Amino acid sequence: MEKRFLKLIEERPLVTREYTAQDGTKKVFHSKGYVFATGLDEFYAELTGDAARDAQPLDAEALYCMQGQIRQRSFTDKNGNRRFENTITILKLA
């Protein structure tokens, strides 16, 4: 697996949302988004949960390595076309 260093392009503010779990209890979901560049591409990725809540501001001058999980989902748009969406969740950031 090739390792690439990432440059921080944008750090989004922490977002906190309340929701009701399936068992009826109130829960809080935290997320914090980042835009990174590889030198060729730019992409958006999110930290979630306690990691997002506890995240310290990143140094815009530093380079980062990220371990993440990429998920895709397909959906049908309003015109009946099948579309795809990717979601990148940050697992580790160093």
Model-derived segments and spans:
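Single-stranded nucleic acid-binding surfaces, predominantly the OB-fold ssDNA-binding core
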Residues: 1-94
